């Protein structure tokens, strides 16, 4: 099931002190099988059925409303027999809120020379044991039905920006986009055949070519799907190219359906994406960067392994209320005090497991809190003012 309601739009679209120029930002509510999601929303990525380094309890405490699972990797391990035994991904990973699963298309694309794409599907060697495997739109729908994810993504071909230095031509992008459209129709047919009660999203492709994006969008809209995603961005293209596609595509999708920007991105990308009309985001950046000592704060990014933090008694971000920065909440409402930059620097330099765990908690809290602040600003009709202040703060530096 899926119900989506737009609660408020950034109606002033560039007029007045609080407006965001050209804004298509909107505040919404998404009702799914396993719960209600307030949008715009960021979705933490749980590739193997876990958000790396973060306990489910911590995800609940920091306000995660929906997380991702990776169809391809869960198909490889633990496999469908185990998933069937548990009745899907929710019970398996002990998560009672909504889950979105990707189709496996991006992971197959990332295998490069290890895979062969045809009209029927993709043949490739398993990265786990080398077995020869075949993934089709139908099989992707079957896997995601077993996973019982609230949102199922169509199987698509992710159009690359370049391949070994060769920039994808319009002709190549068209061929890829049209294949994804044919696969989308097969996904719909199989999804309906399986009587999957959840929601299937289509994925707009077309590379960096606006005319192809428009054709893909129009063809997918004809399928009248519950929601739509913008795919094939943040795949190596210059930032200006992604921004050009974002200015063109999202607001042309149906206003009464949720819009999802796949695999993006930085805090700045999220704010710009909301302004472009996006409702949903996901990215591995908060946790991946955390594992590499790269932290996000209100006043810019911080590299905790730098020597200047060796004796720094400050928390990562004095404005942050996460466990890493503030510590436990005591019975009287006070906090126990968080961890210093010096301690986090020490953990990082020693390779201690707690280091990336605390860093991941902070980064995910930062992202989720950023989205809460965006929702609050939209509720108050002050998104433009918020976006301007956000940019100023981030440029200030830590």
Swiss-Prot record:
UniProt catalytic activity: 7-aminomethyl-7-carbaguanine + guanosine(34) in tRNA = 7-aminomethyl-7-carbaguanosine(34) in tRNA + guanine
Keyword Nucleotide-binding applies: no
UniProt-annotated catalytic positions: 102 (proton acceptor), 282 (nucleophile)
Residue span of region RNA binding: 263-269, 287-291
Source superkingdom: Bacteria
Pathway noted in the entry: tRNA modification; tRNA-queuosine biosynthesis
Binding-site positions, substrate: 102-106, 156, 205, 232
Enzyme class of the recorded protein, top EC level: transferase
Note accompanying the cofactor annotation: Binds 1 zinc ion per subunit.
Single annotated GO MF: tRNA-guanosine(34) queuine transglycosylase activity
BP GO annotations: queuosine biosynthetic process; tRNA wobble guanine modification; tRNA-guanine transglycosylation
Residues annotated to bind Zn(2+): 320, 322, 325, 362
Keywords of this entry: Glycosyltransferase, Metal-binding, Queuosine biosynthesis, Transferase, tRNA processing, Zinc
Cofactor: Zn(2+)
Oligomeric and partner information: Homodimer. Within each dimer, one monomer is responsible for RNA recognition and catalysis, while the other monomer binds to the replacement base PreQ1.
Function: Catalyzes the base-exchange of a guanine (G) residue with the queuine precursor 7-aminomethyl-7-deazaguanine (PreQ1) at position 34 (anticodon wobble position) in tRNAs with GU(N) anticodons (tRNA-Asp, -Asn, -His and -Tyr). Catalysis occurs through a double-displacement mechanism. The nucleophile active site attacks the C1' of nucleotide 34 to detach the guanine base from the RNA, forming a covalent enzyme-RNA intermediate. The proton acceptor active site deprotonates the incoming PreQ1, allowing a nucleophilic attack on the C1' of the ribose to form the product.
Name of this protein: Queuine tRNA-ribosyltransferase
Species annotation: Polaromonas sp. (strain JS666 / ATCC BAA-500)
Lineage: Bacteria, Pseudomonadati, Pseudomonadota, Betaproteobacteria, Burkholderiales
């Amino acid at each position: 099931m899926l119900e989506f309601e737009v609660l408020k739009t950034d109606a002033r679209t560039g007029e007045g002190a609080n407006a965001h120029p050209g804004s298509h930002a909107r505040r919404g509510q998404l009702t799914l099988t396993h719960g209600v999601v307030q949008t715009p929303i960021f979705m933490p990525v749980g590739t193997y059925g876990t958000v790396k380094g973060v306990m489910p309890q911590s995800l609940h405490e920091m306000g995660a409303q929906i997380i991702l699972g990776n169809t391809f990797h869960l198909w490889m391990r633990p496999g469908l027999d185990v998933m069937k035994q548990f009745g899907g991904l929710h019970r398996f990973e002990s998560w009672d809120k909504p889950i979105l699963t990707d189709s496996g298309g991006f992971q197959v694309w990332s295998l490069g020379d290890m895979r062969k794409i045809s009209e029927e599907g993709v043949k490739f060697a398993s990265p786990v044991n080398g077995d020869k495997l075949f993934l089709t739109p139908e099989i992707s729908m079957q896997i995601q039905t077993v996973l019982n994810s609230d949102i199922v993504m169509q199987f698509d071909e992710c159009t690359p920006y370049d391949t070994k230095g060769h920039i994808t031509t319009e002709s190549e992008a068209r061929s890829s986009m049209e294949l994804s459209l044919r696969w989308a129709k097969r996904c719909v047919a199989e999804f309906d055949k399986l009587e999957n009660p959840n929601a299937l999203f289509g994925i707009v492709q077309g590379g960096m070519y606006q005319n192809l994006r428009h054709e893909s969008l129009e063809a997918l809209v004809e399928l009248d799907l519950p929601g739509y995603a913008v795919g094939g961005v943040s795949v190596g293209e210059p930032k200006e190219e992604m921004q050009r596609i974002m200015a063109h595509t999202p607001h042309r999708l149906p206003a009464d359906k949720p819009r999802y920007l796949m695999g993006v991105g930085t805090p700045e990308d999220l704010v710009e994406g909301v302004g472009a009309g996006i409702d949903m985001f996901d990215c591995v950046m908060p946790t991946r960067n955390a594992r590499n000592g790269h932290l996000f704060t209100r006043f810019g990014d911080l590299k905790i392994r730098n020597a200047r933090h060796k004796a720094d008694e400050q928390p990562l971000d004095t404005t942050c209320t996460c466990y890493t920065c503030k510590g436990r909440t005591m019975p009287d409402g006070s906090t126990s005090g968080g961890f210093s930059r010096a301690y986090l620097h020490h953990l990082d330099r020693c390779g201690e497991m707690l280091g990336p765990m605390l860093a991941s908690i902070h980064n995910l809290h930062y992202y989720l809190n950023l989205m809460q602040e965006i929702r609050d600003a939209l509720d108050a009709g002050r998104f433009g003012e918020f976006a301007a202040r956000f940019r100023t703060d981030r440029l200030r530096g830590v």
